[in-house]
C-alpha cells in the first residue's frame, strides 16, 4: 500500500494533473471565446492531455469506497450547452469509432460539445478529489481516471480531435472565401478619377459627350 500511495507524487502524475487542471479551466471559460480561438487552443491542449494520460504509471484502487465526484448533471448540462452554442453548426460530426457502430453500417452522428463535456466530467472529478489532498482517495481517483481513459474518454478525445481539425480548416476556407468576395466587390472612392466637369463627380465622361452633342444640334 505504501508503494501504491506514492504513485500520486511521481513526475508523470504531477504533469498530468497540471495539464488536466488547465484543460478544465479552459473549457470553463470557453463561453467568452471566439470559435476560431477555442478550436485552435483545443487542438493544442487535447493532444497534450492525451500524451500525459498515456504516460501515467500503472495505478490500482486501494480504498473500499468510491471517491467523491464534483460534476453534477446541472454542471454538465451548462457546459454542454455553452460549448454547443459556441460551436454552432460545426458542433455535429459523423463518427465510426463508437460502440453503436456494432449495430449500424452507417456513421453515427456525434457532437463536439457532448464529447468534450464527457471528457471534462472524468477529468474534473479527478482534479476535485486530487485537490482534497487525501492520499488514498487521490490514488483511487487517479486509478479510475486512468481506467476511464482507456475505456471511455481517451477514444472520445481522439474522435473530437479529428472533428476539431476539420472545423479549423473549414473555418479558414470560409474566411478565405469571404475575403475573395470582398476583393471582388467594387465601390468607388474619393480617390477614383472622375470627370469633375462643372463640379460634377459622376465618374462618367460619356454623359457630358452626349450633352455636348445635344447642345450642338440645338445651336444649329
Residue spans of the language-model regions?
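Short, charged, low-complexity loops and linkers
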Residues: 1-6, 26-35, 99-109
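N-terminal interaction modules that seed assembly of large macromolecular complexes
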Residues: 2, 14-73
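Generic structural concept
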Residues: 17, 43-50, 80, 113, ...
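Charged/polar positions within long, soluble alpha-helices
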Residues: 25-28, 51-61, 88-95, 124-135, ...
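Long, low-complexity or tandemly repetitive, helically biased scaffold regions used
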Residues: 51-105
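Amphipathic protein-protein interaction modules
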Residues: 88-154
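Alpha-helical oligomerization segments
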Residues: 136-208
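Conserved small/polar residues in nucleotide/adenosyl-binding loops
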Residues: 212-219
Amino acid at each position: 500500500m505504501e508503494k501504491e500511495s506514492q504513485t500520486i507524487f511521481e513526475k508523470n502524475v504531477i504533469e498530468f494533473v497540471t495539464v488536466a487542471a488547465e484543460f478544465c479551466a479552459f473549457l470553463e471559460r470557453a463561453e467568452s471565446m471566439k470559435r476560431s480561438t477555442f478550436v485552435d487552443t483545443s487542438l493544442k491542449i487535447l493532444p497534450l492531455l492525451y500524451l500525459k494520460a498515456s504516460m501515467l504509471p500503472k495505478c490500482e484502487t486501494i480504498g473500499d469506497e468510491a471517491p467523491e465526484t464534483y460534476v453534477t448533471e446541472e454542471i454538465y448540462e451548462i457546459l454542454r450547452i455553452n460549448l454547443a452554442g459556441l460551436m454552432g453548426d460545426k458542433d455535429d460530426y459523423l463518427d465510426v469509432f463508437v460502440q453503436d457502430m456494432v449495430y449500424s453500417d452507417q456513421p453515427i452522428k456525434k457532437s463536439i460539445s457532448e464529447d468534450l463535456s464527457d471528457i471534462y466530467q472524468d477529468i474534473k472529478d479527478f482534479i476535485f478529489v486530487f485537490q482534497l489532498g487525501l492520499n488514498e482517495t487521490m490514488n483511487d481517483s487517479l486509478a479510475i481516471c486512468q481506467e476511464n481513459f482507456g475505456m471511455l474518454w481517451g477514444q472520445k478525445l481522439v474522435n473530437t480531435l479529428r472533428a476539431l481539425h476539420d472545423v479549423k480548416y473549414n473555418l479558414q476556407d470560409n474566411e478565405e472565401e469571404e475575403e475573395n468576395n470582398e476583393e471582388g466587390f467594387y465601390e468607388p472612392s474619393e480617390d477614383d478619377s472622375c470627370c469633375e466637369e462643372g463640379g460634377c463627380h459622376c465618374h462618367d465622361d460619356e454623359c457630358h459627350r452626349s450633352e455636348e452633342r445635344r447642345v450642338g444640334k440645338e445651336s444649329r
